[in-house]
Structures are given as C-alpha cells and as structure tokens.
Amino acid sequence: MIKFRDTNEPDGLSRLINREIDRALITERALEVKHDYLGASVLGDPCDRRLAYRYAGVEEDGIDGRRLRIFEAGHAFEGMLVRWLRLAGFDLRDLNPDTGKQFEFSVGGVRGHVDGIIARGPDLGVSYPLLWEAKSLNDAGWGKLLRNGLEAANQIYFGQVQTYLSQLPPIVPYGGVSPVRLKTCLFTALNKDT
C-alpha cells in the first residue's frame, strides 16, 4: 500500500506518480509511427552529426518522460496562444482549410508543419499575411530571446523559421486572389515560468 505521507520520503508518492506518467508517455511514443523524413524544425541544429543521424532515421537514445512532458506542455501552451491571439483580433489559421491539417511542405527528405498563418489582424504596422510560430520558454530562454533576438538566442528556432519562410508554398491571403509567398514571421514566445 502506498502511504500518502511517508515521513522517511515526503516526495515518495509524487515520485511514484511521475514515474508512472513517464512510463506511459514513453510507451505511447514507442507506439507512434516513425517519421520517414527530417523535420524542418531541427534544421537549425548546429550539430551536423545529430542532423545526419536524424536524416538516416536513427533515434535519439531514449527520450525520457520529463522531456515528453515538456513537449506536451508546449503543445498545450500553443493552444492557449491560438485562443489569445484570436481573442485579440488576429485571424490565425492553424489548419489548412483544404486538408484540415497543419500547413506543410515537403522538399526531398525534409518536411515542415507550421504552427499557423495569420491572415490579417489589428493595424500594428505589419503587413499580413504572416507565418506564425509559437514556443514556450523557461525564464532563462525568455530573457535570452528578449536580450539577443531570435537568431542569436536560439539557432534551432531561427533555422526553423527561415526554412518555413523559404519552403512553404505560396498561399492566397485573406481576400486575395493571387498566391503570395510569406516573407515575415510573427514568432510568439510564452514565458512558462511567469
């Protein structure tokens, strides 16, 4: 029987619950269909060897439950950002109306799935449409982004945005007739520590 309050190990129950959650997440990931492509979200990785392994389909040595929890929390935060931006008057399209899935592209063995496209929004001095990418960052990453900008703060995220801007097929903007290539990205970051 598990004691809810073990004086010898006060975090015992929490540790046991987290262990079970981690096991379940690891099992769930193991059952997922493996990608047969290199995700554009990793192309900015400065480690050529890691990119080569990923391109060859070699899995990382055991992504642990903690990292899987972080990934899943990031997806939840992204959903919050979608809602907030829409409430603020942005026409944010996170699904391609033609496919019902994320906007995507495929070039050779590389594929990318973008978080969304902002078709129009409040008059803020920017030209619409915009590529939209969302990330949740801890306080240290958030501070680095504010101080240094995206390119210096995170090469992987910067590479991801640049790849999407250059490879995403042209889209028909809101109220438009002719397809246009996205030239600008609204990169939104949520500080998950505050």
What is each stretch, according to the model?
Residues D98-T194:
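Nucleic-acid nuclease catalytic cores
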Residues M1-L131, N138-A140:
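Metal-dependent nuclease catalytic cores that hydrolyze phosphodiester bonds in DNA/RNA
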